[in-house]
Amino acid sequence: MDLITAAAGRGREYGAVERAGYTHWAPTAVARTGLGGSADRRVGAAGRGGAVRSLSAMELSTGLSVRVTHAYNGVTRVSDGTLDSGGHLMQRRDVLRLSALAGAAGVLTLDPMTFTQADAAGTADGPEQTRTLSGHLPTGAPDFVYVPVEVPRGVREIAVSYSYDKPTVPAGTQGNACDIGIFDERGTELGGRGFRGWSGGARTEFAISAEEATPGYLAGPVKAGTWHVVLGPYTVAPQGLDYKITVTLRYGAPGTTPEQGAYPPQRAKGRGRAWYRGDSHLHTVHSDGKRTPAEVVAAARAAGLDFITTTEHNTISSHTAFEGLWGDDLLILTGEEITTRNGHVVALGTDPGVFIDWRYRARDNRFGQFARKVRQAGGLVIPAHPHGTCVGCNWKFGFNEADAVEVWNADFTPDDEITISEWDNTLVAASRGDGRWLPAVGHSDAHREPQVVGLPQTVVLADDLSRTALQEGIRAGRSWIAESSKIDLTFEAVGGRGKHAGIGERLKVGGAAEVTVRLKVSGVGSGCSVRFITDQGQLYGTPVPDSGELSAEWRTTASYAAYVRAEVRRAPADGGASGIPGPMAAMTNPIWLGER
């Protein structure tokens, strides 16, 4: 590494400078520049290094403007840049983008990684070329950092690996976490056609060819043009994030893309109009899950489910991965968990092969656009775990575009309690004519053992076991949630002259007319209790016998209770001393009372 002593600059010494993240161009000269960008002070020659560092007791000036002259294969180019707090060179264009993140999600595009076409390209076992790129991202980096990759003709396979540092951080601060994905030559336009895969932080490497692709990625020809590896620095440590990306192009005959795998059928045999049990938030090895599709299906059947939905994080590669796993007893729907930095949303039952983009925040005002895309693709928009405690899980987009809301996610926890309380407040508002009500659903969000597929599950009254019928039932609120298929219940409200309403329906009676509310529940075990919740709060409660079976009846009027819903709760851990109810075993959507 060359040492440079400034001809003017009070004798400060600077180490070698290299364009951050562009390691195959060797810096040959460094100059300090003024505000106008012209090279006004020669610093000296530079060798390889990766950052500007103090090689003696020097003060490193953050914000120092520099111009680096690079040479590669006889070609010379110039990069203007600014030093960050770690002495890393950031291109001037990148600095401007880092300081203006008002655009969609904040984007930084680096200079391209270039390859030369191999002489033996097109042969069955052609050569391969590898480029490695290193760089540094400061705290406050954009959500997405794009690395253009110039792919020449004759490439059979593109393979990418990456790593980043994970330094110890002060208590109360986030460490480094960085996702990865790729877009092909069709571009990175939001909602465009260039998406070829995403693995989040679940993998450190992936490969794509015509014949096959790593789970989470889409197989297909590797066409010439500008591809983009995309980094998603989810959280960045106070020290910043040092990353390294390696791209390998393998040349040879392109191969043949296999015929597209069969998508799941949209109807199963079913039982006609009936209650169907399902889990519509599930992950496999196609995102950050550990189960294979076959293992998920086996677990679903063991849980007594009638339908499931595959919902991988920001990818649709699983849509063809369930071929041969469905049957008369199990309907498999396709979808996606759209995983943004401001909350996650389940796209339930979208058309197979339809990808929904995730690269936006609430401040970008783009969610409505993509919620409409979900519905155009035949899906439902269901915010997931709105009060989840993981980074980026908290829901920030509001509920105006939602078709339902996931109020119970996996094992019942305090964030589910908060979500249910918030949801119940929306029911109260809707009962007074302030907005519409959203049906509640529950899903397991199961990723791996010991997480249980079907805990919880949504039980839907549908005309048959089909995508359309199930979605109609969910959208109408004709559903309830249970922790397992061992639990069964019926819930109804009955008025005079034979009037009757079930879950999600309205019993149209006068305000003073007597209404009888009936619940039958079984399979809940001992120690549980039943609660009837209305717009006035809890108005009825009773313990469940040790047999786990109960028939409960309560009388009210529409003027006293605008709606009623049922909860079956397990005993609280503290015996009820705190007044906080125990975990949920089952819950229903409301039955509405009154003419309006």
Q: Locations of the language-model features?
A:
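C-terminal segment of N-terminal export signals and the immediately downstream linker at the start
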Residues: 110-136
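Extended extracellular/luminal ectodomain segments enriched in beta-structured repeat modules
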Residues: 152-159
